[in-house]
């Protein structure tokens, strides 16, 4: 018989099918740990010429699974080979002496001090756009001596297992508001999750001396973002927080599902960093069923747990005009989203979005209850570059800052504040430079139960934020990533501080508009701002930089970090 081996990228498995009968003979588990949630992403297969061994490239665990398939139906797992970041193709040479593995994202992430900025354009050699920072690598594994390879495979497997994500031990003090045990009660009943667009840490908070910032590349300092700065000082400043995503296409998937599928990861690079975006459809946010992760999204977990939820703009399609209701293609959001809260639309003010959310909040106060999980989109920090007649990048970001402050002010003055935690993150960090890493971004946790006025330099990511909300709300994790993420426990404490927040007014002109003479205005005219990331990101970032810093200001380059988790030793030192 002739057998067909099929990689099920969204399921951690490989199906072996008899091509004569169409029957599935067996299913191979390609995951490092049996029973793992989705997230291994087996996406490429290779057989030795004699058909004795099958190699499975697992993109998201950076390892190749090896199977003995000489007896189909009774195949045996042999081990794992650690390779580079996000392996996308595995091939055995025709002579069977080498296994070649192409690693799509190379060996690691880095900083991008010369990253793009809204409003500025730098020479191509100096532009460190996140979508172009990945240098693919090739792993070459010697198979010429099968006995020697079998011995090496034991060591390879041990290394792969050491590198797997494992939940860190999380000792907490008595009365901690984030429950570790499933079903344990938390004094926090409500989670509000705010998603913003595309900014790095240094771009917004790089001027804060309390954190690890670089003020030389801070484009939207405290004079532009007073509420971002005040909230970071009043509550917690996170200066070591990263997004797993590169752009909005995978960013909204990671923000809602702690995972981006093989389909999304392989589709978005075709449309980003090129000038042919009309050629490919945006793959995410409910547009394609194949993009949906096997573990579902945050609202799916809430639905399964009986937790009430509501979306404001996330995975929502705008009405043709502001007088027409929005819609959604996501079944779980039907009846659980606000049809009058517009999603991404740079012609629509974030202040109007804030007003709509606040009106809903007041309605819930009158009714006596609100959804326990609310997801709110505030996207206008994306900006429209220097398009003639549009708000300047500074005005857009200041508008977003004021909307952010007003939302927090309203929540903290509401009857729900004593039982609420607000989590805030950017969907990605593609539109700016950062001296630590191109994935570092601004993030917030705002609640009566946070340790106010502190700096937390723990290594966190979007998956950490998702895991924390899941623990508070009693939701199951969605993927291997949130299941193994470091939860954000350090910023919380057992004592509450009910002082509300008072939003600061804007300190710049919110109506400042680009003129025909603005740097890059003519290029901005050709950009598509009807949806997120439809404009050329490299050019947009440069346009924003020069619009703020001046036409002659050179844009700073990407930095990639080897991520290090600091651990406090018994004597209090960081090792």
Feature annotation, model-predicted:
Residues 104-133:
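Short, conserved, GDST-rich strand-edge loop motifs in beta-rich repeat architectures
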